[in-house]
């Protein structure tokens, strides 16, 4: 099924004048033209068939039959082959694991908690099958029957495992689950090493690969941020004597993937322009990934006329099974376009649900859009307007992590905008909280992000204000907020050791309540930031001030050197001010008192001598660390912690 012809005519009408519009800078005209684009066709959007996973064979019966015939041929094994048993075992391992992973692993992750994940039979079987497949790979790569399709399916499987593992590591980074993190990091190393071994074998001609496998291989390296490796592999493939592999890396879908990477490195439009002219003159529909790659390049190059022209062809010629490429390029117009009016027009089409295809608005795209607005215009009102639209659009339908990422970008810009105007900034902050609470229930990450970014104000009152809002909005606190509240004390002067110690004890009690057995690095880092980092900043300020005045600086900081900022209106507090020596002494005492509850002895080195490498002020106190008495530091009753013998 093609996109409707009458809808495509609207897009073509826009393309004719878009060049003049862009060149003349008539933003209003561009916006008006784009408003009539194919994407406004609501009738087609309501067609239920467009949202179903239509089997490939239904769309292209001839290609489907040919594919099944090809698969039967590549899986045939000569009964007399000495590799027969291993080949059949390999095929079974890969097939079973692929079947499991293409019913996304996310479904399994949702059904069972992270603590039980590694014990789940299906989950374990997936990783066992993958591990067994790699073992067989190292044996079978010498076999003449180990063809390009088998290698490609293995790469596909590794790519699936890579994506699921990366997703889990992102989720676990927000949770104190050391064992699960350790497992997934181990799997990540296994996957990276496996992909590297296969790519090395491909480049020396030991194994072959199809375009299907080449795409998964390069995409895997791209997702690992190994862009240079992608380019190295692709360039080397041109000179391979293995014709199957060499041609595979030159297939349109692979070239389409590589185009944005190559442009990012060379900034050359010679080849993209040549490919563009070939596509325009050709009557055949080339692989949509080539269109997608070219569109991304031309958006980056700010050649929007060509980008929109190709997008129009993709809309006209793409079949239902290609809708993912339409979505991908649509998001590129939002996140990568420097023409903010063009980007906002594509953004609004999603927000207003005017798409002829189902689309998920990726938060990374919105984040890029917000950053582009701020960088180009320095217009916070525009940023705020887009953020409001996005929050309303997401509402309560997305994972909290999605909004946490969006809010992190937004509040980074917010505090940059109000860095020297905390009075008006605080009023705006109250307005933001009121708006947000009217759209969805405020959760802990919202205030966590706000509190983290608010440290730039060095204002005690904002910390107290946000702290009270956790209670006001009945938000259950996780260990994350306890760490942030402790860490935030390192951004202000008007606190004292008693408060820092109280915050530390609250953190430890929360860890005990959660059943944690050890003090984690994240806990010690929060304590370090509240004490050592603050002390180092005071020392640096004093040295800088002395240099500016042309007077020698002393090596210690006194209370007279510390200036307490004026609190926000109507939010006064009377906390006393601690000095650098007091905070560092408290830091070292807490470290010493709680050392038995560290997971590893190397943590002591990391947060003493290791810490002093970044914060030299600590060196002045380490010589007396071994003789320091920490008996006056309390330790609450700990039921879950495991104390180590000293």
Swiss-Prot record:
GO terms for cellular component: mitochondrial inner membrane; mitochondrion. InterPro entries: TPR-like_helical_dom_sf (IPR011990). GO terms for molecular function: mRNA 3'-UTR binding; mRNA binding. Residues 1-14 form a transit peptide. Keywords: Membrane, Mitochondrion, Mitochondrion inner membrane, Phosphoprotein, Repeat, RNA-binding, Sporulation, Transit peptide. It is found in: Mitochondrion inner membrane. This is RNA-binding protein RMD9, mitochondrial.
């Amino acid at each position: 099924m093609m996109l409707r012809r009458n809808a495509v005519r609207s897009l073509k009408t826009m393309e004719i004048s878009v060049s003049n519009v862009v060149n003349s800078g008539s933003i209003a005209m561009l916006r008006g033209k784009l408003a009539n684009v194919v994407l406004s066709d609501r009738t087609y959007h309501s067609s239920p068939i467009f949202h179903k996973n239509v089997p490939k064979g239904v769309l292209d019966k001839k290609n489907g039959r040919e594919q099944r015939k090809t698969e039967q041929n590549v899986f045939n094994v000569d009964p007399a082959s000495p590799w027969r048993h291993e080949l059949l075992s390999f095929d079974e391992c890969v097939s079973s694991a692929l079947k499991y992973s293409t019913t996304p692993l996310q479904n399994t992750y949702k059904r069972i908690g992270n603590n039980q994940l590694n014990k789940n039979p299906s989950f374990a079987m997936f990783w066992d099958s993958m591990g067994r497949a790699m073992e067989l790979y190292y044996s079978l790569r010498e076999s003449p029957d180990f063809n390009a399709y088998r290698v490609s399916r293995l790469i596909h499987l590794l790519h699936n495992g890579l994506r699921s593992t990366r997703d889990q590591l992102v989720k676990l980074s927000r949770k104190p689950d050391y064992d699960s993190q350790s497992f997934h990091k181990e799997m990540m190393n296994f996957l990276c090493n496996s992909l590297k071994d296969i790519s090395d074998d491909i480049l020396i001609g030991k194994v072959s690969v199809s375009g299907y496998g080449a795409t998964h291989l390069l995409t895997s390296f791209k997702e690992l941020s190994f862009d240079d490796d992608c380019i190295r592999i692709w360039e080397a493939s041109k000179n391979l004597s293995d014709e199957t592999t060499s041609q595979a890396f030159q297939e349109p879908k692979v070239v389409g993937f590589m185009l944005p990477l190559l442009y990012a490195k060379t900034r050359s439009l010679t080849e993209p322009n040549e490919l563009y002219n070939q596509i325009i003159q050709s009557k055949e529909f080339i692989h949509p990934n080539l269109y997608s790659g070219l569109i991304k390049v031309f958006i980056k190059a700010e050649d929007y006329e060509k980008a929109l022209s190709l997008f129009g062809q993709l809309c006209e010629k793409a079949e239902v099974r290609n809708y993912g490429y339409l979505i991908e390029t649509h998001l590129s117009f939002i996140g990568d376009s420097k023409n903010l009016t063009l980007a906002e027009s594509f953004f609004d089409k999603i927000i207003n649900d005017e798409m002829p295809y189902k689309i998920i608005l990726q938060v990374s795209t919105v984040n890029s859009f917000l950053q582009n607005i701020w960088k180009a215009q320095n217009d916070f009102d525009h940023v705020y307007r887009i953020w409001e639209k996005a929050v309303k659009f997401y509402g309560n339908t997305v994972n909290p992590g999605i909004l946490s990422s969006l809010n992190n970008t937004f509040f980074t810009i917010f505090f940059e905008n109000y860095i020297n105007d905390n009075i008006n900034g605080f009023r705006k902050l109250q307005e933001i909280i009121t708006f947000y609470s009217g759209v969805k229930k405020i959760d802990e990450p919202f205030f966590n992000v706000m509190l983290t970014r608010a440290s730039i104000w060095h204002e005690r009152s904002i910390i107290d204000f946000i702290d009270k809002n956790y209670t006001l909005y009945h938000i259950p606190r996780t260990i994350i907020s306890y760490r942030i509240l402790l860490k935030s004390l390192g951004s202000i002067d008007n606190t004292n050791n008693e408060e820092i110690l109280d915050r530390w004890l609250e953190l430890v009690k929360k860890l005990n309540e959660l059943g944690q057995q050890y003090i984690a690095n994240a806990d010690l880092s929060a304590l370090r930031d509240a004490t050592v980092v603050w002390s180092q900043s005071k020392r640096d300020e004093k040295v800088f001030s002395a240099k500016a005045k042309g007077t020698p600086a002393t090596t210690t900081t006194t209370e007279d050197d510390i200036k307490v900022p004026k609190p926000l209106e109507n939010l006064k507090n009377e906390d006393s001010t601690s000095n650098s020596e007091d905070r560092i002494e408290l830091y070292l005492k807490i470290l010493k008192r709680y050392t038995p509850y560290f997971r590893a002895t190397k943590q002591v080195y990391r947060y003493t001598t290791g810490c002093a490498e970044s914060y030299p002020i600590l060196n002045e106190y380490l010589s007396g660390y071994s003789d320091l008495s920490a008996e006056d530091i309390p330790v609450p009753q700990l039921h879950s912690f495991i104390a180590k013998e000293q």
